[in-house]
Regions:
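Extended, charge-biased low-complexity segments
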Residues: 1-85, 89-133
Length: 133
């Protein structure tokens, strides 16, 4: 049995700017959000540069990763993008060696990736003060 069963949540507090970006997603307040999709959107919206590139490619609840241009992004955002895409697609796209390399993944990004993994597993109940439209 999970230690985060119903009623026992580990709320994640979001920075106001991150919460605002997440609320821009049309499905943010939807009760039936797939946890993996929410985890990917949570992670992508954690970085303003990524979010600006990805948001136009979200339609009808789907993220069209093949249409997202990554040219010119901050190199430290690329592992965050790959982790989000992996969570969304159900594939491991970032290695433990990459996660452990502080030159590739900052401590903040590492924390965001771990939070996204928790969201993918336990759903939106772990996000404190649920995002509302």
């Amino acid at each position: 049995a999970s230690s985060l069963s119903k009623g026992n949540t580990l709320p994640l507090a979001l920075e106001p700017a991150h919460r605002h970006r997440l609320s821009e997603w049309p499905e943010a307040g939807t009760a039936s959000i797939c946890p993996q999709k929410l985890a990917a959107v949570y992670l992508l919206s954690s970085r303003i540069g990524l979010w600006r590139r990805v948001l136009p490619h979200i339609s009808h609840g789907m993220i069209d990763f093949s249409s997202v241009s990554l040219r010119g992004i901050d190199p430290r955002d690329y592992p965050v993008y790959r982790a989000a895409k992996g969570l969304y697609c159900g594939k491991l796209l970032i290695t433990s060696a990459e996660l452990a390399d502080e030159e590739q993944v900052s401590s903040e990004a590492f924390g965001d990736i771990l939070n996204a993994m928790l969201i993918a597993r336990y759903g939106k109940t772990i996000i404190a003060a649920e995002v509302k439209k």
